[in-house]
Amino acid sequence: MKDFKVEYLQILDENGNCDDTLMPKLSNDEIKKIYEMLILVRVFDQKAFNMQRQGRLGTYIQFKGQEACQVGSAFALHDEDFIFPMYRNSGLLIARKHPIVQVLQYWGGDERGLKSPPNVNNFPIAIPVGTQTVHAAGAAMAAKLRGTKQVSVVYFGEGATSKGDFHEAMNFAGVFQAPAIFLCENNQFAISVPRKDQTRAETIAQKAIAYGFEGIQVDGMDVFAV
């Protein structure tokens, strides 16, 4: 059996130490904008959670602790790239120029709140676990056929890796070499199911190897690594 290794990337550790050799080339203004967005989505998340507890929102799924993963990836994309979010991606939408009032509109029960802003390819939030993965693979294939430079990024939790849609999408993207990025936000629990009961694989990232493309493990709380 061929040996394999899954790379782990961390640039900024939990103590604020930065590996300058890996640091992306960002201006001070760009770093400031990223930091401001991290604060904005954190404050939004807490406010929306409070509103839900007050009965002012019907449902709301928090993303506390996952801000860097969503903001960092959003800043790395172009507006014309596709994103396929899950229910825990309100911060991602805001970072992708989705008006806050519309995000609250959606969580208040009005699906029109998910209408993508002009010139930004934000697809609607997927509530069923893992269904957005096949949509993302399809969009990536469409971009390849059209010859554009767009990429398709789909967001999901580790629980989605136990779903059939996930495997179909990964296999399709691998076979046809579609420009898709499968971004798993592993928060260690799929609602109530712990990570250890989802898979026997040592990492989620290594699943990519079986489908013929690269997988990398990244510190999701390190915005620069993301």
Please state what every model-predicted region is:
Residues 43-46, 50-176, 194-200, 205, ...:
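Cofactor-binding active-site loop characterized by glycine-rich and histidine/acidic residues
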Residues 179-180, 214:
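Short, proline-centered helix/strand-breaking motifs
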Residues 170, 180-182, 186:
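A positional/architectural concept
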Residues 3, 10-13, 36-50:
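N-terminal glycine-rich anion-binding loops that anchor highly charged ligand groups
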Residues 26-29, 33-34:
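Positively charged, low-complexity intrinsically disordered leader regions
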